[in-house]
């Protein structure tokens, strides 16, 4: 397990395809209500910055700019403004993005090269990927040290603890199969980060539910999906509910970057697809057709 909440039964909310608006669009609010969803923004990297105490990585969040553009700008010393990185240096931004998401899962140069080549539509050499990873860890040296320290601890002990003290046993680190042992180590490191994000989300949901009950708002949280909280809220209470949820999620529980609480993204709509169904599909008579992409 990764330390996140799990879901099972006839309605397994966590197995709803994330990018399928047909299925998500079936979850609709009744008249007079809205579905409100809140996601933690770039949660895994935010909490990696917290746990590693890497000031350079924390500075990326306090800067307030696009995360991946800021990372690329810092790592590759790009001669442009951060806001222009996405347009002028898309390959470098894709590289920074692939490394950021990959390091917590133990991705090496080969995986980074494949990811960037596919995303940017260019040939991205293995040697370049390794150079970029080296440059990344030169800039974020404390993150590198934290990853190394956690790896050594897990390999030596066969367990790890979440930020709030839950023990995750990892017996397969002692496997004679190096592939299994390596996967177990990666799972342990990833669990430390994901469990913290999940716990913060859960504490925020509990505090919000209690405050909603106290204030007698017509709102009910009906599912938590990884880093998101989804609720059914009466139209008259949507604005207040959103403020309460954001405030409770961003409370400092001892795991926040100073002066920069975790970011949140909120969506409000008639259904769980939040209008994406209408952007992707059209109904002509009884026939459902996909709208051609303009990209």
What are these regions (language model features)?
Residues 1-87, 149-228, 243-251, 282-291:
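Acidic, glycine-rich two-metal-ion catalytic cores of nucleic acid-processing enzymes
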Residues 39-40, 109-111, 115, 132, ...:
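Catalytic palm active-site di-aspartate
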Residues 48, 104, 110-124, 229-246:
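Catalytic palm subdomain of template-directed nucleic-acid polymerases
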Residues 95-104:
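Short, amphipathic alpha-helical "recognition" segments used to contact nucleic acids or chromatin
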Residues 105-150:
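Extended, well-ordered alpha-helical scaffold/bundle regions in very large, multi-domain proteins
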Residues 138-142, 261-277:
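Short, conserved secondary-structure transition motifs
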Residues 251-265:
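Flexible helix-coil linker/hinge segments at domain or subdomain boundaries
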Residues 270-295:
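Acidic, low-complexity intrinsically disordered tails
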